[in-house]
Amino acid sequence: MIKIGIYGAKGRMGKQIEECLKSETQAQISILYDKGGNLEELFEKSDVIIDFSSPSGTHELLNYARTMPKPLVIGTTGLDEKILHLMQSASEVMPIFYATNMSLGVAVLNYLASKASQMLKNFDIEILEMHHRHKKDAPSGTAMTLAQSVAKARNLELEKVRVSGRDGIIGERSKDEIAVMSLRGGDIVGRHTVGFYEDGEFLELNHTATSRATFAKGAIKIAIWLSKQEAKMYSINDFLGI
């Protein structure tokens, strides 16, 4: 049995992973860690660690991991360039999987959106994400991943073409503009729409998550897989083989 440590165990995703691991036949919980816990114990007793914490928590985890390398599955969103660079550096001595969404359906959405962006070159692109009222970051990490993918498919630099809101008399939409909009309310687990719009027709690709168990089960499958991999950075495409 693979021993999985949950970093950020008191959060919504941490609790969901704990619940899903109770019925898992290939893995079991080693340590439930939250802020103020014993990091040394977490690393000593775990074969792999799943992180759904906060940017500051992920930063602390990566710094400690250099002293006791273990496979890390990181699903925390809102990470800045400094933390992403630290993650890349740490992957030289341990396998690290990073994704803003652990859903296999979202991975396919990302793949399809990239292909559609290439094929529908004259279509306007708009991205809409919806989440529960408690979500702290906006746009969602998944929405930004989708935006990066469709921009890259058109050889565009996202930071130069992204629009995060519209208000007042702003003029016509530019050709390369990619809007990423956020809605918050209720208990929506997650919904992402990538729309491609042209005169006379439009195509919308949608993914809706109805339960956090979707992300938790995905993270567990990835953790089991990652425990057998060599030191480097991995993405959802590596896991799926696409």
From Swiss-Prot:
Its main location: cytoplasm. (S)-2,3,4,5-tetrahydrodipicolinate binds at residues 132, 141-142. GO terms for biological process: diaminopimelate biosynthetic process; lysine biosynthetic process via diaminopimelate. NAD(+) binds at residues 8-13, 75-77, 99-102. Gene3D superfamilies: Dihydrodipicolinate Reductase, domain 2, NAD(P)-binding Rossmann-like Domain. The keyword DNA-binding does not apply. It catalyses: (S)-2,3,4,5-tetrahydrodipicolinate + NAD(+) + H2O = (2S,4S)-4-hydroxy-2,3,4,5-tetrahydrodipicolinate + NADH + H(+); (S)-2,3,4,5-tetrahydrodipicolinate + NADP(+) + H2O = (2S,4S)-4-hydroxy-2,3,4,5-tetrahydrodipicolinate + NADPH + H(+). InterPro entries: DapB_C, DapB_N, DapB_N_CS, DHDPR_bac, NAD(P)-bd_dom_sf. One of its GO terms (molecular function) is 4-hydroxy-tetrahydrodipicolinate reductase. This is 4-hydroxy-tetrahydrodipicolinate reductase. It comes from Campylobacter jejuni subsp. jejuni serotype O:6 (strain 81116 / NCTC 11828). The gene is dapB.
